[in-house]
Amino acid sequence: MCNVHAQQGSAQEAPPPGELLLIDKPLDWTSFDVVAKVRNTYRKCGSKRKVGHCGTLDPKATGLLIVATGRKTKEISQLEQLDKVYDGVIKLGAITASHDTETPEEQLCDVAHLSEAELHAVAATFIGNRLQQPPMHSAAWHNGRRLYEHARKGEVIRERKAREIVVHRFTITNVALPFVSFELHVSKGAYIRVIADEFGAALGVGGYLAALRRTAIGEWQLTNALSVNDTIEQIHNNASKGALCGTASTIHPAT
């Protein structure tokens, strides 16, 4: 999902040059929180520009978020087509309504009988094309309302429109039951929370996403990202030098 928040100048103003910022989204921040922070920082520095992001991260997820500004917001639709890579942890032996830590655990059960071989074998069955329904606790639309709005009213929409995704890689990296660490390489639009829920269901014990960190979007790597605070500091430093584009976290797609 991509979102662009416009800061409109006068009709005579030329659109400002833009940048693509690699930001490490903190825990419990929404992607919109990060966009708002960047947008407000530019405003305080006297620069009016569009600011948007590509690839929404849930509040309980951390990691790579690409924030586009100025003319670079035109590249968001291209960037959102890229594959994503994640590191995460699934907790087995329980489920939650949101498929992550946002809601309480339910249906607890024992997982001591599970073997590592079984975990690897089930993970392998997820590789390839598959249809995935968006979770009820998500921003997907249904009849003009977000699914999470229905969920907050206790409504369950069973005819949620499924989308086709591709799981390129699902690797179990560590097992310390009930926790299973993994790496996932998926196509655009994949809900990792749903994969965690389906993984637990396939094992017959239930499961939910206990932690998630995005490490790559296409060729863009988390290792090159800045924290929110460091990004804000870069913007202020560049403003003081009279150069608001070209920060250390700016990236330029290959041409």
Swiss-Prot record:
The keyword tRNA processing applies. It holds the Pfam family TruB_N. It is an enzyme of class 5 (isomerase). Keywords: Isomerase, tRNA processing. It catalyses: uridine(55) in tRNA = pseudouridine(55) in tRNA. InterPro entries: PsdUridine_synth_cat_dom_sf, PsdUridine_synth_N, tRNA_psdUridine_synth_TruB. Its EC number is 5.4.99.25. Transmembrane segments: none annotated. It comes from the Bacteria. The active site is at D58 (nucleophile). Belongs to the pseudouridine synthase TruB family. Type 1 subfamily. Responsible for synthesis of pseudouridine from uracil-55 in the psi GC loop of transfer RNAs. This is tRNA pseudouridine synthase B. It comes from Chlorobium chlorochromatii (strain CaD3).
